[in-house]
Amino acid sequence: MIFVWLNILFIIFSFQVFAGDVIVIVDRFKHKNEAPVKFSICDSEECHIKRDKGYVDIDGELIEVNDNFRKYRIKNVEPGECSLSAYHDLNNSGKLERSGILGIPQEPIGFSRLDVQKIRRHPKWDEVKFHVDENDTSVMVHLVNRFGL
């Protein structure tokens, strides 16, 4: 009987998926204030294409601050491909401020792995995706203040 229970426990635990933490290093802060950085995560290309409607807000724990960057830990991210977007919430409103019909961001934003000085378009999935496994995964987000053509 004990062997049956051991086999059942083995089967249950062998299918368990272990989530990993993502360490996010955010840099290029033009505004030297202590306003929070807000994160959103996306786990597929289909989700990424939907832009703001596809991404899900996620909390990041601030673990290090210096003059050049801030480091955050996002806990328990499911293994697989994903992308992050971030914005510096300058007015602490809890939402990305946009202007006009085109919805141009009024606060600095960035995406995982995207290293540009100016955002001209929504980045492609292959430009921003990264792999998460059960170990800690590190990714850079460079904030950008300039948008458009």
Predicted regions and their residues:
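Cleavable N-terminal signal peptides
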Residues: 6-7, 17-18
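A short, amphipathic beta-strand motif
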Residues: 22-29
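Short, flexible loop/turn segments at beta-strand junctions in immunoglobulin-like
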Residues: 28, 73-77
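Extracellular beta-sheet/turn segments enriched in Thr/Pro/Gly and aliphatic residues
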Residues: 108-148
